[in-house]
């Protein structure tokens, strides 16, 4: 189940809307979700499909000359733990290396706050990301922001 690059901006938006609308446990703030969706039009994005339909996607955003952020990622719940997320991260890492980035970062809610996000944290750790820093009030006090980083140097 390889992930593929999505070149058409309208298709990126369509995929983001389709996936995120089905993941309210992670994307339950409408304004924030809409921002992820509209930003997808301007970001490098990857998709995994099953039977011709998108089941997961990931978008990247440059945050510095050497760093790219995994800006948003979603995989439909029935497809969790089936390799789709790993395929998306692998494709994003390959793209980031090819593009010349040295680091990838991702933000999520700190481990220990919500079970859904604990699974997300464990996934990023399993992909090789390392804990970098926690910003307790970046989003709000109920959602402390954990930043993970991944070195893209081999």
Describe the residue ranges of each PLM region:
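Short amphipathic alpha-helix that is part of the acyltransferase structural core
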Residues: 1-31
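Short hydrophobic/aromatic beta-strand or adjacent loop that forms the aromatic wall/cage
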Residues: 43, 143-148
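Conserved beta-strand in the GNAT
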Residues: 47, 53-61, 67-74
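A short, internal acetyl-CoA/4′-phosphopantetheine-binding micro-motif in the GNAT/acyltransferase core
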Residues: 73-81, 110-112
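Conserved acetyl-CoA pyrophosphate-binding loop and the N-cap/start of the following alpha-helix
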Residues: 79, 83-91
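Conserved GNAT acetyl-CoA-binding A-motif
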Residues: 96-116
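Short glycine/proline-centered loop/turn elements that form peptide/ligand docking sites
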Residues: 115-120, 134-144
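Conserved active-site tyrosine of GNAT-family acetyltransferases
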Residues: 124, 129
């Amino acid at each position: 189940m390889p992930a593929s690059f999505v070149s058409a901006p309208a298709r990126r938006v369509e995929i983001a809307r389709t996936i995120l609308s089905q993941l309210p446990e992670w994307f339950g703030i409408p304004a924030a979700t809409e921002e992820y969706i509209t930003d997808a039009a301007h970001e490098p994005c990857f998709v995994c499909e099953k039977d011709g339909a998108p089941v997961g996607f990931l978008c990247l955003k440059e945050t510095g000359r050497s760093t790219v952020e995994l800006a948003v990622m979603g995989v439909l719940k029935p497809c969790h733990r089936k390799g789709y997320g790993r395929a998306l991260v692998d494709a994003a890492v390959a793209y980031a290396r090819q593009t010349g980035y040295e680091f990838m970062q991702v933000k999520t809610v700190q481990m220990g706050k919500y079970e859904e996000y604990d699974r997300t944290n464990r996934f990023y750790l399993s992909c090789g990301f390392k804990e970098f820093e926690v910003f307790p009030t970046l989003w709000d006090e109920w959602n402390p922001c954990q930043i993970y980083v991944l070195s893209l140097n081999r």
